[in-house]
């Protein structure tokens, strides 16, 4: 469901994505509107679910979690014997999502069913996660682990292309 926003809404969203610690007063000054308008627009966008959360972005390297990996996983949809109930992609994805090491789980198309992103202390910790936790999940057929050498871009901000799609006519 798409919503229509005005230029001020989009300016507020852009500023909040860049720095969620900005006060309403700082936002009002930057985009030259009354502070009451900023409060009202933010409240409306929160109620509409456009603004879901405010959070800090932590440095994995400073917290000894500098190793990132992406794991492709295939789900076995058929029960191994007649007594078992088949398991769904979603069930396996939800089980994987419970692990604290896991940052993201996506149900995808193609030869693989799931894409998992995780952070760990080192390559050994990634290996232990895959062998001792991930591969024990019922319904998981096989995995392919891709270690990250270097991250060129990592962002939680939505691209600015949303601007043209959401502007009120």
Regions found by a protein language model. Give the residues of each.
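A compositional/biophysical signature of low hydrophobicity enriched in polar/charged and small residues
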Residues: 1-169
